[in-house]
A protein has these predicted regions:
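Linker/hinge segments immediately adjacent to helix-turn-helix/homeobox DNA-binding domains
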Residues: 1-19, 49
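Basic, amphipathic alpha-helical hairpins
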Residues: 7-14, 29-42, 61, 65, ...
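Short, Lys/Arg-enriched anionic-surface-contact patches
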Residues: 13-25, 59, 66-74
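Pre-recognition alpha-helix immediately N-terminal to the DNA-recognition helix
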Residues: 24-32, 73, 77-80
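Terminal helix-turn-helix DNA-binding modules in bacterial transcription factors
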Residues: 40, 44, 63-103, 107, ...
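Alpha-helical residues within the helix-turn-helix
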Residues: 48, 59, 63, 96-97, ...
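Short, basic interhelical loop/turn and adjoining N-cap
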Residues: 49-56, 99-105
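Short, basic/aromatic-enriched C-terminal tail that caps enzymatic domains
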Residues: 109, 113-123
Length: 123
């Protein structure tokens, strides 16, 4: 965890507002996800790694960021997806890379966050 905290100043700037927690364990989690947004690790795996229960993680994350861990993680993934789409990747490839089970679920989540579909972004 201390190694991850040392890496914070080296992180690239995030081009969107993103609430960050203060708890060192949650900072380590968020840092790892910022570096690898499409990480397949589940919340249970993160909790085991961080030595906390799922309920504790959920409660702390909500209190310190104002949103749920799942919502925060989805925002990271969708912003990463947007960058991939802007680089010319196909909607299908990006949806699968971001861990969505279906392209339609990805499109719905993308539209909810950005107000337009991935296809509209490409135009």
């Amino acid at each position: 965890v201390s190694v991850l905290l040392d890496q914070l100043p080296l992180l690239p700037e995030v081009g969107f507002p993103l609430p960050m927690p203060r708890d060192r364990r949650l900072v380590a989690l968020c840092t790892a996800l910022l570096n690898e947004p499409d990480s397949p690790e589940t919340i249970r795996e993160w909790c085991t790694r961080l030595g906390m229960s799922e309920r504790t993680l959920a409660r702390l994350f909500q209190r310190q960021t104002g949103e749920s861990f799942g919502r925060w993680r989805q925002r990271i993934r969708l912003h990463h997806a947007r960058a991939q789409l802007e680089a010319g990747e196909s909607v299908t490839a990006v949806a699968l890379n971001c861990g969505y089970a279906s392209v339609s679920a990805f499109i719905a989540a993308f539209k909810k966050l950005f107000g337009r579909t991935p296809g509209q972004l490409a135009r």
